[in-house]
Curated annotation (Swiss-Prot):
This is Voltage-gated ClC-type chloride channel ClcB. The chain crosses the membrane at residues 5-25, 54-74, 146-166, 173-195, 222-242, 258-278, 288-308, 316-336, 339-359, 380-400. Probably acts as an electrical shunt for an outwardly-directed proton pump that is linked to amino acid decarboxylation, as part of the extreme acid resistance (XAR) response. PANTHER family: CHLORIDE CHANNEL PROTEIN CLC-E. It comes from Salmonella typhi.
Length: 417
């Protein structure tokens, strides 16, 4: 057991280093190509001329597509191992190292160029790949899946500062159940990854800064649970829209480079309306939580952002769908909060409260993992007083969503990509 805990610690450190390497590579490329050192792609887009804002996502998509297409052509004849940590866990615990690195590099290109896709997909993949490489060299074959799972959880902890949610992500989504025998090393890896990330970043700050002073009474719980009901309907709709977008791109019968370029061009066109469509939505989520926008502005940004997410995901851009889902959930929750605010005092507080509820419940509705979704929002924001209400709302959203659509967003995304 102590041997496993030691290995889990080492994997946590490796995973944090992998996440940090991807993050620093992003910052370097943003500085080189976009002259941006703020870490915010929205700020980068605002500083570009309209024509550069238009073509940059298209060029990034084209470059990523050429990279993936070229690698595929070069390796047509050799057998393929998984390039996805979920698939690796469901098979024999092995990765195609070269293809996984190429996929991560392609993800880096589309993320840096502004596509509305999450960076966490590549971060978790690299963390799991680092864990797999270590495990194959130093551990018996029957343990490989455990260490890949530990690496994936540690990658999520490093990316989102949420070790408990990262561990439950593995337990609820990948293992399908809370397996206590396997959860110990997974939790250790996740916590060590978070601590290592804090050391590398020089701070232990939360991922999102929130100033919420509202007291929770029966009225607030009713609003939170009602947000869960709405998210339970929106989750299947969002997944259906992603599938429809993916099928629409396939019907065009374009080669991968041109398909990804078209997706990037759509994002570029939308960014002419509002630069907030660039990137995974992290900086916009933070600005909304600090200063909730007006009703009409939420609706306009939401419409443009969801079209950008559909274009990026549907075109096959390699990356995650986790953070974009958080943005969509925040917008839905704040939209509902503004509606409640027509009749109730403290409209900004209500908007922030239901924005957080929207993030948690739409995440639960799309992942079918209510416990993970609840803890994720609490760990990212530090608002643990919301836990009871969010847990009820997330269960409601997950049950309703699963009733309407059996597959989660991760199973759907894996099947399409």
């Amino acid at each position: 057991m102590f041997r496993r805990l030691l290995i889990a610690t080492l994997i946590g450190i490796l995973a944090a280093l992998a996440v940090a390497a991807f993050r620093h590579a992003m910052q370097l490329l943003e500085w080189i190509f976009l002259s941006n050192d703020t870490g915010s792609l929205v700020n980068a887009a605002e500083g570009l001329s309209p024509w550069r804002r238009l073509i940059t996502p298209a060029l990034g998509g084209l470059a990523a597509g050429l990279l993936l297409w070229g690698w595929q052509k070069m390796n047509q004849q050799r057998p393929h191992a998984p390039t996805d940590y979920m698939e690796a866990l469901q098979t024999d615990g092995q990765f195609d190292v070269g293809a996984s690195l190429v996929k991560s590099l392609a993800s880096l290109l589309v993320v840096v160029s502004g596509s509305a896709i999450g960076r966490e997909g590549a971060m978790i993949l690299l963390a799991a790949l680092a864990a797999s490489s270590f495990a194959r060299r130093f551990t018996p074959r029957e343990e490989w899946k455990l260490w890949i799972a530990s690496g994936a959880a540690a990658g999520m902890a490093g990316a989102y500062h949420a070790p408990l949610a990262g561990s439950l992500f593995i337990a609820e989504i990948l293992f399908g159940t809370l397996m206590l025998a396997s959860l110990g090393p997974v939790v250790v890896s996740a916590v060590v990854a978070l601590l290592t990330t804090h050391v590398l970043n020089g701070s232990d700050s939360l991922l999102y800064t929130v100033h919420l002073t509202v007291d929770l009474y029966a009225r607030e719980y009713v609003m939170i649970v009602s947000t869960g009901l709405v998210a339970g309907l929106w989750g299947p709709l969002l997944m259906w829209l992603m599938t429809a977008s993916h099928n629409s791109f396939l019907r065009l019968k374009l080669s991968p480079p041109w398909q990804l370029a078209l997706g990037g061009l759509i994002v570029g066109l939308l960014s002419l309306l509002t630069p907030t469509v660039w990137g995974n939505g992290y900086s916009v989520v933070q600005s909304f939580l600090l200063s909730p926008p007006l009703f009409s502005l939420i609706g306009g940004i939401f419409a443009c952002k969801i079209l950008a997410v559909l274009a990026s995901s549907g075109s096959g851009a390699p990356g995650g769908v986790f953070t974009p889902t958080l943005f969509v959930g925040l917008s839905i929750g704040m939209f509902l909060g503004r509606i409640w605010g027509f009749w109730l005092p403290g409209s900004d507080e209500i908007a922030i409260l239901l924005g957080l509820a929207g993030m948690a419940t739409l995440l639960a509705a799309t992942t079918h993992a209510p416990i993970m979704s609840t803890l994720m929002i609490c760990e990212m924001t530090g608002e643990y007083q919301l836990l009871p209400g969010l847990l009820i709302a997330c269960v409601v959203a997950s049950v309703l969503s699963r009733t309407l659509r059996h597959d989660s967003i991760y199973r759907q995304h894996a099947a399409e990509h």
